[in-house]
């Protein structure tokens, strides 16, 4: 009697698939960076584009020398966080998902295309379980 050996590679259902796209956006129109409603709308649309499921979205405006806006979307798959500093014309963007079918890069690229920074950096991290 012969035995067959099967591959023990875990399927996506047997592990967490963590996809993390994050980066820095430089030299953005400071009027965009202070428009809380616009920024919240961009994050909401990015949730849809990335095929994520929104749980809640919150946003805050901060004054002072390092003032700006923070928008955080809690999604079933994880989160999108956008933080701006208008005086520096700078923003950071973090899109993390554990959803197999979600696309954090699409969300990142959508927000970047709408904020139109003169320069940006995008990084990827695989945060999947083993």
Curated annotation (Swiss-Prot):
GO terms for biological process: arginine catabolic process; polyamine biosynthetic process. It is an enzyme of class 4 (lyase). Specifically catalyzes the decarboxylation of L-arginine to agmatine. Has no S-adenosylmethionine decarboxylase (AdoMetDC) activity. Its cofactor is pyruvate. It catalyses: L-arginine + H(+) = agmatine + CO2. The keyword Lyase applies. It comes from Sulfolobus acidocaldarius (strain ATCC 33909 / DSM 639 / JCM 8929 / NBRC 15157 / NCIMB 11770). The modification Pyruvic acid (Ser) is found at residue 78. Binds 1 pyruvoyl group covalently per subunit. This is Arginine decarboxylase proenzyme. Its EC number is 4.1.1.19.
């Amino acid at each position: 009697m012969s035995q067959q050996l099967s591959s023990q590679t875990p399927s996506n259902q047997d592990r967490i698939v963590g996809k993390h796209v994050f980066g820095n956006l430089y030299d953005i129109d400071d009027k965009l960076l202070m428009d809380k409603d616009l920024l919240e709308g961009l994050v909401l649309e990015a949730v849809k584009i990335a095929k994520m499921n929104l749980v809640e979205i919150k946003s805050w405006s901060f004054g002072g020398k390092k003032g700006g806006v923070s928008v955080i979307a809690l999604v079933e798959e994880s989160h999108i966080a956008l933080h701006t500093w208008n005086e520096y014309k700078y923003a950071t963007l973090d899109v993390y998902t554990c959803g197999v079918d979600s696309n954090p890069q699409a969300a990142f690229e959508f927000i970047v295309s709408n904020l139109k920074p003169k320069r940006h950096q995008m990084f990827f991290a695989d945060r999947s379980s083993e």
